[in-house]
């Protein structure tokens, strides 16, 4: 038996029946759950019930099977007063009131009342004091319990009834109900109108005292699933004082926790089934163990944030975790959140803006110095700079950011995807580069624009079975355009099988284009130049000078100086920096002084200047200044390549121009492994749009959930160059997302452009065009007016559909009647002519005529005015252009005697 102290001090009264003692204990939860005993009262045999009074001197009452009631003091443990009944019989239940009264319920006796009330102070001074009141009935009492903060007493009688007694009067029933649930009465501390009691076989009922005079007093019955009628049952009910509606039950060596919630009833007079079980969890006890008591436990009574169930298992304490019930919630396609708690629904809009397109995206520049990001575009450098320049000053500030649901939902990737779609984020790579705010995605789309233009213009020429289009530096340098994994990279690194052939092809491309691309290392120079060209780094000297001048005009002198350094124009670095601001002029003086004093051939000598330059390379924030001083300090390009704040594109250009062959191969392998694993999308400049690039994109999705960008990028090469199941999954996920948002037009454009991109170098479309989802069928023969590419589709058609808008392709001559049954086609309600003629578009099989694809699409757009259109309300039809012209000035249907009003006006 276990009861928590009413003083809320974390202590418990524990009846140890095997030792005939009662202990006043606390629970020591760490490092191991154990008792911490404060007081022990011994020689208390056959204790059947206990209760405590929470006054200044906490008093414990213990009733025994002989009827004796022992009064024990926590403040004075040596004190003990024993109240002896006139006739020996079990004391079944005790209850202390707020007004210092003690009520005891006894088993039935022929000669003495079974319900007695004493004044507590009188008993403490004289245990033989007579009761203030006693019941006139002689029925046995199984359970007694006071309603919180009231003089009303609830009693359960062995005559199978529950009574409400006003203790300000005689102990006679004010109201009562006949029920089999009369044992172990406990009152809900949060809702005193509710109380729980159990029957002999262990079923539990929840009562509402407000309906005792009606037939609706029973709220819910909780059946006991562990009934063992032949075995004696140890039963206990405990309400939690920390969370409303939590009821713990001990029955047949099994512990059950239920979360009870009240229903909302429109009619207050009807209370049937007004309580329901929202959550239930069972805590089984091992068969060879015995649980002798339960109660609720929390490590801190002042801040009860973590409530547990305390059970006495084999006389030792054991804690059972109490997990809150799962709160149902759901997101809609627009990232709004709604959740339910109890009987209410709580919607949370993702932002206070009208649309997600108005949501300001999460701006990393609030936390990172702006100059660092202006000159750095790699994903890895962003992470580095964020962690380097920022730290959370306090847990409170971090907590506030995490709890701002507007910001969390508004900057969620789903909101970002929706915002991009509305702005036209599709297959125009140049436009995509302008739409995205992330600098590394800007560079990525710029490279895809370059690669797509090179592929469309056949810039690399006819190279036979070797295709350099959409290739990155890795595939070109290792002379393997079909890299699928890192193992292929390592194999290609050692292979020399196609070296002569690829070098010859690369030399032919460079000579044909007449390009003068700078590389400091002359070995495999055509291959280096081709890799630089494919990565968008193939600037000639004239292009380099133009780019440097453009940067100087934009006052980006440091970036211009870095660009000159990366192209071997070391003498121009000082001149460019000297034309900048005061700080840049000072830095140019330092660089010039070192170059003048040491000379280019002595960069590696130890000197004070070298040490200062090395320190500056780690302390400066601008990545280009860091790179300049990293090179000046040691004249070693490896130090510059270790500068992670530089964009991957810049580091790749340095490696291709200045590293020897073996060092370049090793560096590209290491860089590839890092970028693929991290999912850095700028790494596609290295891997290209290859199966290995698809692996990088998969890791990018795993890190960002940006399936939109991955699906768009993959469409440039899948299925035109190779098949990839991952890319197909991304595409279908993105299409499904657009459909959920009901952006059917954008999804249709996505499908159309994907089909156009799937055209290979021979003009063949490798992707099957998406079938239209709307058909116009004849209302008489139920066959499609426009022929299908697959004639068998005509056999399984739905019921006649006459309302809708057809978007079929260009048609052959149809005339004014159905091509199948000859019935006349509907007439235009504006012009009166038939809706079918030779200009009405129908579906055609473009996969058979790929060379006419763009021409036919443009033809469809020009003929849109002659397409079928029908009112969804009245069913009258018209040519699309005629309907548009009519309803631009009218609101009523043009058919006489039809009063259908346009819903869009």
Curated annotation (Swiss-Prot):
WD repeats: 42-82, 86-128, 136-175, 177-217
Organism: Schizosaccharomyces pombe (strain 972 / ATCC 24843)
Keyword entries, A-Z: Phosphoprotein, Repeat, WD repeat
Protein name, entry field: Uncharacterized WD repeat-containing protein C12G12.01c
GO terms of molecular function: ubiquitin protein ligase activity; zinc ion binding
Domain of life: Eukaryota
Family matches, as SUPFAM superfamilies: WD40 repeat-like (SSF50978)
Family stated for the protein in its record: Belongs to the WD repeat mio family.
PTM annotation (Phosphoserine): residues: 394, 397
GO biological process: positive regulation of TORC1 signaling
Coiled-coil region(s): none
PANTHER family with a match to the protein in the record: GATOR COMPLEX PROTEIN MIOS, WD40 DOMAIN-CONTAINING PROTEIN MIO FAMILY MEMBER
Family matches, as SMART domains: WD40
Annotated Gene Ontology cellular component terms: cytoplasm; cytosol; GATOR2 complex; vacuolar membrane
Keyword Phosphoprotein in record: yes
